[in-house]
Structures are given as C-alpha cells and as structure tokens.
C-alpha cells in the first residue's frame, strides 16, 4: 500500500496527486482527512507523474495535508445468491435496513470478456404482459432491447411493469430481475422500493438505486455492479436474468461531467469521444454463452433530450442494441398507457423468438398485418385533416377506425394488466376483423380460416 501527502490540486470531484511509483488505472484509493475521516476514490488517469483521482464522496474537507493511500486493487463486487430480494445503493450498500451482504465471491465489476464464438443465438420468447412489446416488438431471451422515452413520459412505470410481469412462458427454469436506477430523485427511489415490496416482485429481484445527489463516479459504477450481479446469478446459478436500467441518459451525463472535469477533448455535443465504447462495454454483457444454462437479457431505458432520436445517446445506443421501443408523447397526450408507438419501434431478433412452439404460428403474420393497417390508418388521418371524413371511401373509413381502435384497445392497457401472448394475438384478430377479409393481405388464408373471429364462430 503506497501512501502520499503530495496533493497538488483539487478541482471539483477530482484530486491530483504527485507520485513516485507506478499506480494502476482504476486502482482504489483511500483519502484520510486531517480529522481522521476516510473518503474513497478511484484512479482515473495515471499516465503522468500526477495521478488524477475521482473522489466518490466529493472533495469537500480535503486539504493538502490529507494523505492518499493507493490500495493496489480495483473495485470488486461482493456477490451472493442471498442478494435476491434486496435493495442496494448505487455503490452496493444495503438500503432496505437488512444486514450486509455476506459474499460467496468477490468479482471484478468490469466483467469477463465473452468469446464471440461461444455466444449462442437468442431464441426464447420473454412475455412482458405488454401487448405492444409481446405482439409487435417481441423481447427474446439474451437480447438487448432499449426503450427510447422522453422527459415527463411514464417510462419508469413501464420499467416497473416489465420487472413485475416478465417471464418465460412454459419454463420452470429460475428467472430473476436486476433493476438498476441511476440519477433518480429520492421520491422516485421511494416509489420504486414501495412498488417492488407491494407487488411481491422483490422476491426475485436485486434492486440498485443511485440517487441524483450521489457522486457522478458512482453513477458510472452502478450499472457495472448490477451487471456483475446479473452475470453471477446467470452463469454461476443458472438463472435467466433480465437487467433493466433507467435512465441511461443520466449515466451518459455523468460521463460528460467526469470528462469535463478531466479537461478531455469533447466529442459530439460535449460528450466524450469514447462514449460509444463505454456503452458497448455495458450492453455487450448481455447474451447466452455456450455451455452455460443461464442468460442475460437487457432492457436499457433512456430519455431522449428534446425528444431527439438523433441525439448521440439514443443514436449510439441504437448502433449497439438490437432494436428499440419508442415511447411517444402524442399517445401520452391522449392519455394512453403505455404510450408505445409501434411505428418506429423494432425488435431485430423478434423472428427468432416467435412462431409455432414459441408463441403461436400466426404471430408474425398478425404482427405484419397490424403494422400495415395501422400505418395506413395513420396516413388517412392526415388526409382527413385536409378533405374531411366525408370524402373517404368505405374502405378508408374502416382503416381509419382501425387505427383509433388499435390505439384505444391494443396499445392502451392497465398498469397492472398482464396480458398473455394468446390474449394479445386474439385481441389483434378482433381488431383486424374490423377490416374486410380481402384487405388482410399479409396473412395466409389458413390462419384466417383458423383464427379470424368470423370463422371461429361458425
């Protein structure tokens, strides 16, 4: 353990220390104040004779007389299966009044590198109970599928609903949720804690809560602690783990804040140039590994600044992940929950997780037909604004009515409503029956004969 009393500068959350011996990147540091108080930190830059240290608890109270001890190790996460049912802080400390975690192992939070050749193709359907996701943008086990939202939209409610309801239908294999909230207010933290406890979802979950007034460096660490926990449960205890993060925008803002404090050359809109690589380090920890029974599925949630989908955060996230679920402000204004706009939404792995033996044989065709009919109905709304409804043909009126009914019955559902995939597909058929059968050009006749409401009643 190396100890120095050579603090040369204090700038915001950073401490600069002159060194004489080599110091490791991301090495842990203890700063002992003159009154004996100990603060923790981490090495951010050790390339020069002056080491940059990010102080977790902030630099107030630190002076040139404070001593800096380099501990010779990086952050390790104490993990145990007993973490299920626990609520932890962004640094892994208990928030629920329970005892400290007695670790079975202490793991590096950066995670083990996964050989790309050893990854298995995702193929198992995860039912979230939300029709717009299950029916139109299916989540597959091992996938990373982000939710793009905006400020003031109910993405936290959607996150909680997915955490409560997500399951692999027909599977008896153990399923767990790791919920990671970053940069949230104390009020939001209370809401999350109460909801998990009220619904009983906490029994199969590990919850990490990083608050808005916690240090920026902790916000960088929190998702890595969550993913390390998920990897331990998945690959050591053969569990299928769903990791939900909210809000990745707060994480990226912390990256920008730390980059500015280090006086790095900024990239697009002031974010560090390595943000793509940093996000990939998190998202690429999802997947299924050959020879392991467990899996990790990720649902990162982010708020798009100014609802701009071309902003660097959603833009880079879209390059790394396998699709996106888009939460729309216009649907929210109509008081529709969840306000998920299926038109720009996409699940790139959907075709691998649906069909006979997984969901139902007609799933792909019904989804395609709903997309097509809804798009046509939305286009007709623009035409109605110009020429009026009376100028429409009977066929056009049917598509217009379908678009309204689709939003009101298929997209809209209760916050506690858990629809099975059969209920979702049957509801889609009920809505498609509003259209003439000859307009269902995306669906094979054998499925129309089997599932169309007018045929089933005979």
Swiss-Prot record:
CDD domains: ATP-synt_V_A-type_beta_C (cd18112), ATP-synt_V_A-type_beta_N (cd18118), V_A-ATPase_B (cd01135). It is a peripheral membrane protein. It holds the Pfam family ATP-synt_ab. InterPro entries: ATP-synt_VA_C (IPR055190), ATPase_a/bsu_AS (IPR020003), ATPase_A1-cplx_bsu (IPR005724), ATPase_F1/V1/A1_a/bsu_N (IPR004100), ATPase_F1/V1/A1_a/bsu_nucl-bd (IPR000194), P-loop_NTPase (IPR027417), V-ATPase_su_B/beta (IPR022879). It comes from the Archaea. PROSITE patterns: ATPASE_ALPHA_BETA (PS00152). GO terms for molecular function: ATP binding; proton-transporting ATP synthase activity, rotational mechanism. GO terms for cellular component: plasma membrane; proton-transporting two-sector ATPase complex, catalytic domain. It is found in: Cell membrane. Keywords: ATP synthesis, Cell membrane, Hydrogen ion transport, Ion transport, Membrane, Transport. The keyword GTP-binding does not apply. One of its GO terms (biological process) is proton motive force-driven plasma membrane ATP synthesis. PANTHER family: V-TYPE PROTON ATPASE SUBUNIT B. Has multiple subunits with at least A(3), B(3), C, D, E, F, H, I and proteolipid K(x). Component of the A-type ATP synthase that produces ATP from ADP in the presence of a proton gradient across the membrane. The B chain is a regulatory subunit. Belongs to the ATPase alpha/beta chains family. This is A-type ATP synthase subunit B. It comes from Methanocella arvoryzae (strain DSM 22066 / NBRC 105507 / MRE50).
């Amino acid at each position: 353990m190396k100890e120095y009393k050579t603090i040369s500068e204090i700038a915001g959350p950073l401490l600069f220390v002159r060194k004489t011996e080599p110091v490791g990147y991301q090495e842990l540091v203890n700063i002992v104040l003159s009154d004996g108080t100990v603060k923790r930190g981490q090495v951010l830059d050790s390339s020069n004779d002056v080491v940059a240290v990010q102080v977790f608890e902030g630099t107030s109270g630190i002076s040139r007389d404070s001593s800096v001890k380099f501990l010779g190790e990086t952050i390790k996460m104490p993990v145990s299966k007993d973490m299920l049912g626990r609520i932890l802080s962004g640094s892994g400390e208990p928030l629920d009044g329970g005892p400290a975690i007695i670790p079975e192992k202490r793991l590096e939070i950066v995670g083990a590198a996964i050989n790309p050749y050893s990854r298995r193709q995702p193929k198992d359907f995860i039912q979230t109970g939300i029709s717009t996701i299950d029916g139109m943008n299916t989540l597959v086990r091992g996938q990373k599928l982000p939710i793009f939202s905006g400020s003031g939209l109910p993405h936290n409610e959607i996150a909680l609903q997915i955490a409560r309801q997500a399951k692999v239908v027909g599977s008896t294999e153990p399923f767990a949720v790791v919920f990671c909230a970053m940069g949230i207010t104390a009020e939001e933290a209370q809401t999350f804690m109460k909801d998990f406890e009220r619904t009983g979802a906490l029994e199969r979950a590990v919850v990490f809560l990083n608050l808005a007034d916690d240090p920026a460096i902790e916000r960088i660490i929190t998702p890595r602690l969550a993913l390390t926990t998920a990897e331990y449960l998945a690959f050591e205890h053969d569990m299928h783990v769903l990791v939900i993060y909210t809000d990745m925008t707060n994480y990226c803002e912390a990256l920008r804040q730390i980059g500015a404090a280090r006086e790095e050359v900024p990239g697009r809109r002031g974010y560090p140039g390595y943000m793509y690589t940093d996000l990939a380090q998190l998202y690429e920890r999802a997947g299924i590994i050959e020879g392991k029974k467990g899996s990790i599925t990720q649902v990162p949630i982010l708020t798009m600044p100014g609802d701009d989908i071309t902003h660097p955060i959603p833009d880079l996230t879209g390059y790394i992940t396998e699709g996106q679920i888009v939460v729309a402000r216009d649907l929210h204004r109509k008081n529709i929950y969840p306000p998920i706009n299926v038109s720009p939404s996409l699940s790139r792995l959907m075709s691998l997780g649906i069909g006979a033996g997984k969901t139902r044989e007609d799933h792909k065709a019904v989804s395609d037909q709903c997309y097509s009919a809804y798009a046509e109905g939305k286009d007709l709304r623009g035409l109605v604004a110009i020429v009026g409804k009376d100028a429409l043909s009977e066929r056009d009126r049917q598509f217009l009515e379908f678009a309204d009914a689709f939003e009101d019955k298929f997209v809209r559902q209760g916050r506690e409503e858990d629809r099975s995939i059969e209920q979702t597909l049957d509801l889609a058929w009920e809505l498609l029956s509003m259209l003439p059968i000859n307009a269902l050009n995306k669906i094979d006749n054998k499925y129309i004969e089997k599932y169309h409401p007018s045929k089933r009643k005979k």
